[in-house]
From Swiss-Prot:
GO terms for biological process: DNA-templated transcription elongation; regulation of DNA-templated transcription elongation. InterPro entries: GreA/GreB_C_sf, TF_GreA/GreB_CS, Tscrpt_elong_fac_GreA, Tscrpt_elong_fac_GreA/B, Tscrpt_elong_fac_GreA/B_C, Tscrpt_elong_fac_GreA/B_fam, Tscrpt_elong_fac_GreA/B_N, Tscrpt_elong_fac_GreA/B_N_sf. Keywords: Coiled coil, DNA-binding, Transcription, Transcription regulation. This is Transcription elongation factor GreA. One of its GO terms (molecular function) is RNA polymerase binding.
Length: 158
C-alpha cells in the first residue's frame, strides 16, 4: 500500500506540473535522443545509444514514482484546520528557552519543506514536537544534539 501524502494547493500544483513536464517534454526528448543515437550506426559499440537508453529508463522510473505520489496525494482543506493548536500549515512563532532567540516557521508536508523559506516538515523533530501544542505551551523537542525547549508565542494561518 502506498503512503498518502498531504499537500497544499501550491504543492499539489507543482507536483502535477513536474509530472506533465516530464511526460510532455522530457519523454519525447528521450525518445528523440535514442533515435538520433540509433542513426549513428552499429548499436553494439554505440555508447551514445546506451547512455540515451539508460537516461530514458531513469526518466520512466521518475515518471512512475511521481504518478504514484500524485495518485496518493491529498489536498489539505485549510478552512477545516483548528487555529488554536499547531497543525500542518500553521505559522508558528517560537522562542528558544535556552538562548531567548525567536523564530518563525510554517509547518508543511514533508515534500514541501524548505528551511530557507522557513517551511519545516511536520515529520521533522521540531515539527513533530510542535504539533498539537497551543500558545503558551513549552515544547520539549529531542534533536540529535540534545533536548531543546521552545515556548509557543503565536499561531496563525496564511
Amino acid at each position: 500500500m502506498s503512503k498518502v501524502s498531504y499537500y497544499t494547493a501550491d504543492g499539489l500544483k507543482k507536483l502535477k506540473d513536474e509530472l506533465e513536464h516530464l511526460k510532455s517534454v522530457m519523454r519525447p526528448k528521450a525518445s528523440q535522443d535514442i533515435a538520433d543515437a540509433r542513426d549513428k550506426g552499429d548499436l553494439s559499440e554505440n555508447a551514445e545509444y546506451d547512455a540515451a537508453k539508460e537516461a530514458q529508463g531513469l526518466l520512466e522510473m521518475r515518471i512512475a514514482k511521481l504518478e504514484e505520489v500524485y495518485a496518493n496525494a491529498r489536498l489539505i482543506d485549510e478552512s477545516q484546520l483548528d487555529v488554536s493548536k499547531v497543525l500542518v500549515l500553521s505559522n508558528v512563532k517560537i522562542k528558544n528557552q535556552s538562548n531567548g532567540m525567536e523564530m518563525k516557521y510554517t509547518l508543511v508536508a514533508e515534500s514541501e519543506a524548505d528551511l530557507k523559506t522557513g517551511k519545516i516538515s511536520v515529520t521533522s523533530p521540531i515539527g513533530k514536537g510542535l504539533l498539537g501544542k497551543s500558545v503558551g505551551e513549552i515544547a520539549e523537542i529531542t534533536v540529535p544534539n540534545g533536548t531543546l525547549k521552545f515556548e509557543i508565542l503565536e499561531i496563525t494561518r496564511e
